[in-house]
Swiss-Prot record:
PANTHER family: GLUTAMATE CYSTEINE LIGASE (PTHR11164), GLUTAMATE--CYSTEINE LIGASE CATALYTIC SUBUNIT (PTHR11164:SF0). The keyword Zinc does not apply. This is Glutamate--cysteine ligase. Pathway: Sulfur metabolism; glutathione biosynthesis; glutathione from L-cysteine and L-glutamate: step 1/2. It comes from Dictyostelium discoideum (Social amoeba).
Length: 626
């Protein structure tokens, strides 16, 4: 999870005096990175994936809070064999979470694609070596009853000093200082606990104020006009059919699937960054896998907005609710959100009109970058990141060598969690310019995760080689991200997408370049010359020098994604919703009780380990590769 260092971290009140220093030297470090790497060229197409896992107790289906113990054992393998280890393991926010990546980057496409699924499978096996007989790991996006009574093993006390949550004990937080410091400092910076609000699914027996009744035993909880979001009657948390959550763990405790790609040079990285931005909401909808939160069926299908709200550190001034006295900017988004601007490249496909959002950026940072030869688009991108405060400052890493270190830059960069991330090379490294695709939700099986990993890698190469053009206005990308959260958006809703992905239109109205399409139309085409992204990928694959085995497997992955887009194969969110609604213990009141959760998690385990095959989410067994 982002930039992690060793050492003691500063509490917010101790950090404040260093904020400007960190920002100032972060800019200096950024300029050094650009100066040293602006002409860097890397030959190989290196790439990789990140998969996040949760640990559960098989006896009671509670979250098992000992992932850090298992992680220590896994990382010991890496220390013993740093150059030959098959997998790398890193801490994630939850004490019940582990993040796994390949031990070394994948290189190119071709036969390399045959190893993706086996690598994911061996990752599971690697973790399972250290599990107790009553423990399992799962790749599910959200644990259904997170925040309900006694949902962890061991049990913890709520209202702890770090999160001050009514629902989550501090014991769910990874013991590494970064995570507790992030949690406390976000809360302190914003001036109170985070306030996460999402719509509840309204079933026929769902009470209007169900969450408030369960939480406060009042309807609504407290009626007053104070500024406290938990007591203000106008607050979203007090609205009917609302699910309220109050801690970073509700968001950062969700699991995702991410892919990162090294491009030949800075210009290609800028191109891929821009082209993946409009693709991101589509991938969120296509991978939607989270419909239960805090023990309730929600009316959304994806995690992104929950994480966005869970780390929103904006205070009243930055939210525009009070005059700017102690802060510089009114900021329109959480620091975990969609991108705010394209960064352009030498490609002729970019037009300034696509950046139609009123970008908030630090003009002093922008001017310094401009004065040092950074172009306007890239300067605005980084100056936008620097409107945020650093959240985690290590006490022994404040005064460092800006020529050799990038800690202060990464402090800012790594806590701007956006749908796509533009990643400069680290210092003194052979690593090149990279782009990270971040919105995808983790899937139940290694095949499903491999399908999306492979698809995204081939798409990135196709963007480069075919000069694909997905540009639409940034505001339309934002609308698409909102749409992606809707229940069953993958089959029910329409998204803005470019009509012709092969042409550039240097003149004329950009409104004529895009239209509303379903996910099925975007991926499987509308007939005629419009083959959709699946058709583009299939045509592109035919030009590559794949052997028969690779071609057969890749076509299985592509077929799976095509059927997910058409609705023939259900999304995990839709399947989850139907599982709950058809469960004999469900009372059509939106409540997912312990019995339902136990059966649901057991079904997830059975599918992920191959005990049960469910064609509704896995497709035809003949098309599945195990």
């Amino acid at each position: 999870m982002g930039f992690i260092a060793e050492g003691n971290t500063l509490a917010w009140e101790d950090s404040v005096k260093y904020l400007e220093y960190i920002r100032e030297h972060g800019v200096i470090q950024l300029l050094n990175i650009i100066k040293n790497n602006k002409d860097k060229v890397t030959e190989d197409f290196k790439w990789g994936d990140e998969v996040e896992y949760i640990l559960i107790n098989n006896d009671n289906y509670k979250l098992k809070l000992r992932a850090n113990e298992i992680l220590d054992l896994l990382m010991l393998e890496e220390k013993r064999n740093p150059t030959t280890v098959e997998h790398l393991w890193r801490p994630e926010y939850g004490r019940f979470m582990i993040e796994g990546t390949p031990g070394s980057p994948y290189i190119g496409l071709g036969k390399q694609l045959l190893s993706i699924q086996s690598n994911l499978k061996s990752r599971r096996e690697n973790v399972e070596k250290y599990l107790k007989p009553n423990e399992s790991i799962l790749t599910i996006t959200s644990y259904p009853r997170m925040g309900c009574k006694n949902f962890t093993d061991p049990q913890g006390e709520v209202k702890g000093p770090i999160a001050e949550s009514k629902f989550l004990p501090d014991t769910v937080i990874n013991p590494h200082f970064r995570f507790s410091t992030l949690t406390a400092n976000i809360r302190k910076r914003r001036g109170g606990t985070v306030s996460i609000n999402i719509p509840m699914y309204r079933d026929k027996n769902t009470p209007e104020y169900l969450d408030q009744i369960c939480t406060y035993e009042k309807v609504p909880p407290i009626l007053d006009d104070s500024d406290n979001s938990q007591t203000n009657i106008s607050s979203p948390s007090n609205q009917p059919f609302n699910i309220y959550m109050d801690a970073m763990g509700f968001g950062m405790g969700c699991c995702c699937l991410q892919t990162t790609f090294q491009l030949p040079n800075i210009d290609d990285a800028r191109t891929v960054y821009d082209q993946l931005a409009p693709i991101s909401p589509l991938m969120l909808s296509l991978t939607a896998a989270s419909s239960i939160f805090k023990g309730y069926l929600s009316d959304i299908d994806a995690r992104w907005t929950i994480i966005s709200q869970s780390v929103d550190d904006r205070n009243k001034e930055e939210l525009g609710k009070a005059p700017l006295n102690n802060n510089k900017f009114v900021i329109n988004k959480s620091r975990y959100d969609s991108i705010d601007s394209y960064i352009g490249s030498k490609s002729k496909s970019f037009r300034s009109e696509y950046n139609d959002l009123d970008l908030v950026y630090d003009k002093d940072v922008y001017q310094k970058l401009i004065e040092n030869g950074v172009d306007s688009l890239l300067s605005k991108h980084f100056a936008h990141l620097f409107i945020r405060d650093p959240l985690v400052i290590y006490s022994d890493k404040i005064e460092i060598d800006d020529e050799k270190n990038t800690d202060h830059f990464e402090n800012i960069q790594s806590t701007n969690w956006q749908t796509v991330r533009f990643k400069p090379p680290p210092p003194s490294s052979s690593i090149g310019w990279r782009v990270e695709l971040r919105p995808m939700e983790v899937q139940l099986t290694d095949f499903q995760n491999s399908a999306f990993v492979v698809f995204s890698a081939i798409l990135v190469k196709a963007i480069q080689d075919l000069k694909l053009n997905f540009y639409i206005p940034i505001t339309k990308v934002d609308e698409n991200l909102k749409t992606a959260h809707k229940r069953a958006s993958v089959i029910n809703d329409k998204f803005y997408f470019r009509k012709n992905i092969y042409n550039n239109t240097p003149n004329g109205s950009i409104e004529n370049e895009y239209e509303l399409m379903t996910i099925n139309e975007i991926f499987n085409g509308k007939g005629g010359d419009n083959k959709g992204l699946i058709g583009v990928i299939r045509d592109y694959i035919s030009t590559l020098d794949f052997d028969n085995e690779t071609t057969e497997l890749v076509n299985k992955y592509i077929k799976f994604i095509s059927k997910r887009a058409s609705g023939e194969i259900k999304s995990i969110s839709t399947w989850t919703r139907e599982f709950v609604q058809n469960h004999p213990a469900y009372n059509h009141d939106s409540i997912v009780n312990d019995e339902i959760q136990a059966d649901y998690l057991q079904r997830c385990l059975d599918i992920s380990n191959g005990t049960i095959y469910d064609s509704s989410i896995q497709g035809d067994k003949d098309d599945y590769y195990c």
